[in-house]
Amino acid sequence: EDGDPAKGEAVFKKCMACHRVGPDAKNLVGPALTGVIDRQAGTAPGFNYSAINHAAGEAGLHWTPENIIAYLPDPNAFLRKFLADAGHAEQAKGSTKMVFKLPDEQERKDVVAYLKQFSPQ
């Protein structure tokens, strides 16, 4: 089943401790997520990323809906696996600032559907 943007808006309230989305969104503890869909990881303007996030972006990670859905249950494990699979295991050091986890698959699909509304199609 695809995500429901209305339900995703409710799920996104959990993310708002660190993130904002929308035309006036600013970086907080986490980067603003306006335009995040298909964006290269580690490239939100003006945000100071952790080394592992920056390395994943340099290694080619883009925030496709599928990658976001795979990332949210365990951000650090996802980034380490991505870097290892890309042949950059030596850069999989440290951890992302994102300690929040979203284990429920339907909630992940819903929040991606919500974020898609703020990204050019």
UniProtKB/Swiss-Prot annotation:
Molecular-function GO terms, alphabetical: electron transfer activity; heme binding; metal ion binding
Pfam families per the UniProt record, alphabetical: Cytochrom_C
Family: Belongs to the cytochrome c family.
Residues annotated as binding heme c: C15, C18, H19, M98
Biological process, per Gene Ontology: photosynthesis
Keyword set, alphabetical order: Electron transport, Heme, Iron, Metal-binding, Photosynthesis, Transport
Post-translational modifications reported in the UniProt record: Binds 1 heme c group covalently per subunit.
Function: Cytochrome c2 is found mainly in purple, non-sulfur, photosynthetic bacteria where it functions as the electron donor to the oxidized bacteriochlorophyll in the photophosphorylation pathway. However, it may also have a role in the respiratory chain and is found in some non-photosynthetic bacteria.
Protein name: Cytochrome c2 iso-2
